[in-house]
């Protein structure tokens, strides 16, 4: 099992080829973000990820994945993680507990907790 120090590599290994995670792009650290605008401007067709916040205290990435896609079991050594499900459904595993989450759910994972996600259902999450 691995830590996720290199987020670009983690996402590529998990099948997310369309990503914008490098520091300094136009969507990062702005006060207002529109997800549909990002999708239209970047013309991402399948799974994608865009970092929208990154500083010493917090990081935020918008991710869209198709059913069956997800990530491998991993942990974050230096930070807690918070997810807001905007659409679709995920199967979440945190340590030994597995649950299904859907649109409107918020998930919090403490630092050093093993976790993984898989998009499930019949539409992207």
PLM features: what roles do these ranges have?
Residues 1-59, 72:
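A short, N-terminal "cap"/entry segment at the start of jelly-roll beta-barrel domains
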Residues 50-54, 62-64, 71-77, 118-120:
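Short histidine-centered beta-strand/loop micro-motifs
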Residues 62, 108, 122-125:
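A short hydrophobic beta-strand segment most commonly corresponding to one strand
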Residues 63-66, 75-93:
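Short, conserved beta-strand element in jelly-roll/cupin
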Residues 72-73, 92-93, 109, 115-121:
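Short beta-strand His + acidic residue motifs that chelate non-heme Fe in jelly-roll/DSBH
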Residues 89-91, 98, 114, 124:
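Structural motif
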Residues 96-112:
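Short acidic-glycine-tyrosine-enriched beta hairpin
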